[in-house]
């Protein structure tokens, strides 16, 4: 305030001209300094001024390699695995998108990387049971494995059934639990119903890095039921906002973020395309990798979706609809065992 102790600049000029002039000049210098600071900050945004940071980023990336999903064909399509970015898996119901992403999370954890799973629909223990069920099935199929040991999720969690299980069946389940326990310490499951949004996810990631020193892979199941950023906004607006925030999270934390997306209007009989994600423009434009699941043979003459859905072994295709830094259009074939929560590549 150039007037200082006086009521206005006019009085200051009359009663203390020198100090008033000095105050005005100081204010002008401050304004010039602020303007220069803004100019310098703007000029630093040029690509030329960012080259050193760019080179430093390349050097730093040596210590943050891509993270394999555990599926060889998928990793090959993704240039080795998951990188910093937003990965979205979408499908109609009954194609196993939650099972697939949960299995990917487990396989990442088995390799020693922490994974944060935000389950907005399934309970924590149900997710754990799905993983243990998968292990019972895999063990039962090994040479000399106990065939009756393969158990569904319900077969794992329903305590009453244990009164009817043989000791060998119980031992088989306990062995699967032990196998799961070998990497379960790398999996952190947060469950919620309508109360987990982008900010809660960001804070949990921040806390995990602070408390463990590890940057986790982030999994959200699923996108459309995240807590709305603005309750009065439309579903589309809130989904768009969530996608943008998850993209920002992946960039700020330099980690892969995987989100499951539902298809509300897609048909089982129509091949999956980018149009299935049109309900949210942000999914289409902000995601780095967009993968749609469909039954093998979808769209071909004679294809029967109901018959495909009834099979105990379902042939599923992963279609790479968008890959910001790689090939698009690839179709990867998988065999899905819905009873035992397992996806496998035919060549495995």
Give residue spans per PLM region.
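The Walker A/P-loop phosphate-binding site
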Residues: 40-150, 175-178
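TOPRIM fold recognition
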Residues: 1-51
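Conserved nucleotide-binding/hydrolysis micro-motifs of P-loop NTPases
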Residues: 4-6, 121-125, 133-134, 193-196, ...
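Conserved P-loop NTPase "ATPase switch" module shared by AAA+ and STAND
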Residues: 213-229
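C-terminal regions of RecA-like/P-loop NTPase motor modules
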Residues: 143-144, 151, 156, 178-182, ...
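Proline-centered loop/turn at the N-terminus of a beta-strand
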Residues: 114, 254-256
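Flexible beta-alpha connector loops of hexameric P-loop NTPases
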Residues: 163, 190-195, 228-240, 267-275
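Cytosolic-facing regulatory segments adjacent to core modules
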Residues: 76, 110-213, 228, 331-333
